[in-house]
């Protein structure tokens, strides 16, 4: 079962275009799915509801900023298994667990595996709205960071092997003259490699490029 809201114009308090504005709800309780969808859509949050894990996993779009409200106990594939499958794919989807039988070990496990929150059923509607809004904010940040990382990785992929060697040395703080000796090339060639690195990556300076890499969590090993 899937429930999808209609497209709505932007209103004050709703996510702007390009922001995270979708919540997946995965719970085998049909009525709970519907009630949560109505709650979220009452504040203009798009919702897609699923009553089984396979349907969700087939519909999940890893390139769309969203968050997931996930029941722990379901027939077949349970909530923790869904979380494991998402983690295995390096998904940046924030997960909010819900359970009618929650306990401390269960909530600790969920959070240790990357969930952003854990709510017990029946949950307070306002608390759920607050948690989901926070999850959508987190989703927007995570997807923006991933997009920036992919952009930097694509630019680095354009470098030749020798340009990569040069960049690794620069990242390590090695002076150009020492780079020339280590790589067995002339200082002029090192300067040419540095210039081509800037040109291919669109960076004003190598320092700016290295700064972008650090912000994206990329180091020498990823060059």
Specify the residue positions occupied by each region the protein language model found.
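Non-catalytic signal-transmission and effector/linker regions of two-component phosphorelay proteins
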Residues: 1-24, 30, 37, 151, ...
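Conserved acidic segment of CheY-like receiver
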Residues: 17-32, 36-40, 53, 68-71, ...
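The feature encodes the CheY-like receiver
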Residues: 33, 75, 99, 103
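Acidic, metal-coordinating helix/loop segments flanking the phosphotransfer/catalytic sites
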Residues: 49-67
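Acidic catalytic/metal-coordinating carboxylates
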Residues: 51-52, 75-84
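C-terminal output helix
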Residues: 103-105, 119, 123-132, 178, ...
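Basic, Lys/Arg-enriched C-terminal extension of HTH/homeodomain DNA-binding domains
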Residues: 198-223
């Amino acid at each position: 079962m899937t429930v999808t809201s209609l497209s709505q114009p932007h209103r004050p308090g709703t996510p702007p275009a390009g922001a995270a504005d979708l919540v997946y709800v995965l719970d085998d309780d049909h009525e709970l799915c519907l009630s949560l969808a109505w709650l979220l859509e009452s504040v203009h949050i798009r919702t897609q509801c699923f009553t089984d894990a396979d349907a969700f996993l087939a519909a999940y779009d890893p390139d769309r900023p969203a968050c997931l409200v996930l029941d722990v106990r379901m027939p077949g594939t349970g909530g923790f298994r869904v979380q494991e499958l998402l983690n295995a794919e390096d998904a940046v989807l924030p997960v909010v667990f819900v359970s009618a039988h929650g306990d401390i070990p269960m909530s600790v496990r969920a959070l240790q595996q990357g969930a952003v929150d854990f709510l017990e059923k029946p949950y307070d509607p306002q608390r759920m709205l607050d948690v989901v809004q926070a999850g959508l904010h987190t989703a927007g940040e995570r997807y923006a960071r991933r997009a920036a990382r992919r952009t930097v990785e694509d630019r680095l992929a354009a470098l030749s092997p020798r340009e990569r060697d040069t960049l690794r040395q620069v990242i390590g703080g090695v002076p150009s003259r020492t780079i020339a000796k280590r790589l067995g090339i002339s200082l002029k060639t090192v300067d040419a490699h540095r210039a081509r690195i800037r040109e291919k990556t669109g960076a004003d300076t190598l320092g700016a490029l290295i700064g972008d890499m650090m912000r994206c969590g990329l180091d020498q090993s990823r060059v």
